[in-house]
């Protein structure tokens, strides 16, 4: 059974960045559509086109972090509750999402991701 709306396990930007930097084993899932994922996402993220694809790929005992654009985006909240309702035990939501991640100057991937290469003339 899904917990009440107010009872959501979260992860903050610093902890998520540390987990990624250390190479911790967990699944990072962007809860937006494919277009948004292709535009930009946090490195190491996964995107699933369908619920069937998602649930056949994730194991209920895996640690899963879900995110979308910001605290005001409810796609990750809905996915969080869907996973918990299906007995996924280690689920957390990164509420700050892409907006907070990008504002902190952390790396992004995708067609619209800002380039992190040093500026200067091309060789």
PLM-predicted stretches and their roles:
Residues 46-53:
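Glycine-rich, highly charged phosphate/nucleotide-binding loops
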Residues 33-46:
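Acidic/glycine-enriched edge-of-secondary-structure segments
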Residues 105-109:
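Short low-complexity, flexible loop/linker segments enriched in glycine and/or proline
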Residues 55-102:
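Catalytic cysteine-centered active loop of the rhodanese-like fold, especially the PTP/DSP P-loop
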Residues 12, 49, 95:
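Short loop/edge segments at beta-strand edges and connector loops
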Residues 22-28, 43-44, 63, 89-90:
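Short active-site oxyanion
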Residues 1-36, 110-123:
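Flexible, polar/low-complexity N-terminal or interdomain linker segments that lie immediately upstream
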Residues 33, 51, 97:
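A generic "binding-loop/recognition-motif" signal
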